[in-house]
């Protein structure tokens, strides 16, 4: 297994859907989309359907009964007007999400999911389900794994690279090899911060952005909680993620 990391969707090579592309793609958005997705599916959501475009989200959501859907939307770290939930993993509790489909669009994470949507195997990872995703990949043994960060509006993010390094650390222990320099750098970042990932999330520029927006202590704790979940969000059809146990 060869593992590569690309900081944002815009850095993903155009060969993604060709013979030199990945057998599996893993999307990362630690603050906060892939953390929220993992917790929503863990807490019983029927599925999370992701959209880069808000008009497409609303059109698809309107085809579902009100009692079976939730609109989850965020731009700039804030909940969108008219949506049921923002992008906080603390909001997707069982009483709210169980049995429902979440129609989700965020500033960054849903763009990366859209970029890799045609890959045969698409997963999402965050720190809470790091080991579950690692075990899924170790069991399946795809030849090429591309991790794709979400960044912030097309630019590098510290926290996504941290999670990429965390996942790669588990994969390398099982015999995987590093395929690009971005992956090597992410591993070095994880080595530096693995004993206190929450501190890394807080000093990251997006962490600082959330701090300026208000009290997000609970979000930071949840996003930094390592290996707490066994759920592996897996694309069942383009844009639709469902829970699979790791």
Curated annotation (Swiss-Prot):
CC cofactor: Mg(2+)
Keywords attached to this entry: Hydrolase, Magnesium
InterPro entries tied to this protein: ComB-like, ComB-like_sf
Organism superkingdom: Bacteria
EC number: 3.1.3.71
Gene Ontology terms for molecular function: 2-phosphosulfolactate phosphatase activity; magnesium ion binding; sulfopyruvate decarboxylase activity
Enzyme class: hydrolase
Record's catalysed reaction(s): (2R)-O-phospho-3-sulfolactate + H2O = (2R)-3-sulfolactate + phosphate
Gene3D superfamilies documented for this protein: ComB-like
Keyword Cell membrane: no
Pfam family, one: 2-ph_phosp
UniProt similarity note: Belongs to the ComB family.
HAMAP family from the UniProt entry: ComB
Name of the protein: Probable 2-phosphosulfolactate phosphatase
